[in-house]
A protein has these predicted regions:
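Active-site-proximal, well-structured secondary-structure segments within enzyme catalytic domains
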Residues: 24-27, 34, 38-72, 115, ...
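Second-shell loop/turn segments in exported
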Residues: 3-4, 78-80, 98-102, 133-144, ...
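Short acidic alpha-helix initiation/capping motifs at coil-to-helix transition points
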Residues: 1, 71, 107-111
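Active-site-adjacent "gating/activation" loops or surface patches in catalytic cores
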Residues: 63-100, 186, 191
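Extended, charged alpha-helical coiled-coil/arm scaffolds that mediate oligomerization and mechanical coupling
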Residues: 1-36
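A conserved hydrophobic secondary-structure block that centers on an alpha-helix together
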Residues: 7-18, 99-114, 118-131
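Short, charged/polar, low-complexity loop and linker segments
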Residues: 3-4, 93-96, 198-200
């Protein structure tokens, strides 16, 4: 199997093609990740529209022309989605986050998909999914699809229950029995339910788990593995 996957069974010409494809894939994957990591999108948010966001987060955001200059790094983006009570702010920030490096990366993603298909075809696999799953427990794409079909009704039942709870929380919060639920509402009402129902405040928990302490703890654990 490894012999086949590495392309050793191919002709010399096809092995060279495979090497070229793999090199391009490596370069494109790095470029894709770099574009997201280095995205400099700024979302202008009017003063007063970060209500509910922890003050230490707000204090770290620049202000220009009566607007907060919200960046999309997680330490800023995360708390806004979790705690900002202004729906329009959550909507704008989440939408911008989902589009990070979109113009550059859509083209790169299309090229990656095409190259992966070419590599799978060259190696004799029916699909890229079959190539990717061959070394996994599932062994092939058909097994994965079958598993998902069996899992779907089980997961759906729990998801519908969670969805109903989140929707009810939003409608109660707004006093609007007809309010709809949107993707940018999820984190906010999930945190609200945790706080209201289970008295779990993620911000309070973080006070006892500062990043450096967590990193030091993880380092100590890995040293003993």
């Amino acid at each position: 199997r490894d012999y086949r996957r590495s392309g050793m069974s191919l002709s010399e010409e096809d092995r060279e093609k495979l090497k070229t494809i793999q090199k391009k894939l490596g370069t494109l994957t790095i470029e894709f990740d770099t574009n997201i990591r280095e995205d400099k999108t700024i979302v202008p948010i009017p003063l007063g529209d970060l209500e509910g966001v922890p003050q230490d987060v707000i204090d770290g955001i620049d202000v220009v022309d009566e607007n907060y200059q919200v960046t999309l790094d997680y330490p800023t983006f995360g708390p806004i989605l979790d705690y900002c009570s202004v729906a329009e702010t959550r909507k704008n920030v989440r939408f911008a986050y989902s589009k990070r490096a979109g113009l550059e990366n859509v083209e790169i993603l299309e090229r990656i998909i095409k190259l992966r298909d070419e590599a799978s075809d060259l190696l004799g696999y029916a699909t890229t999914a079959d190539y990717e799953t061959e070394t996994k427990m599932s062994k092939n794409a058909a097994t994965v699809a079958e598993f998902y079909e069996k899992l779907r009704p089980v997961v759906r039942k729990k998801a519908e229950k969670d969805w109903a709870e989140l929707l009810a929380a939003k409608r109660e919060d707004l006093g609007d029995p007809t309010a709809d639920f949107y993707p940018y509402d999820f984190s906010y009402y999930y945190e609200k339910i945790k706080n209201d129902k289970y008295a779990v405040d993620s911000q309070k928990v973080q006070e006892y788990l500062p990043l450096q302490n967590v990193m030091d703890g993880l380092f100590e654990i890995t040293q003993n593995l």
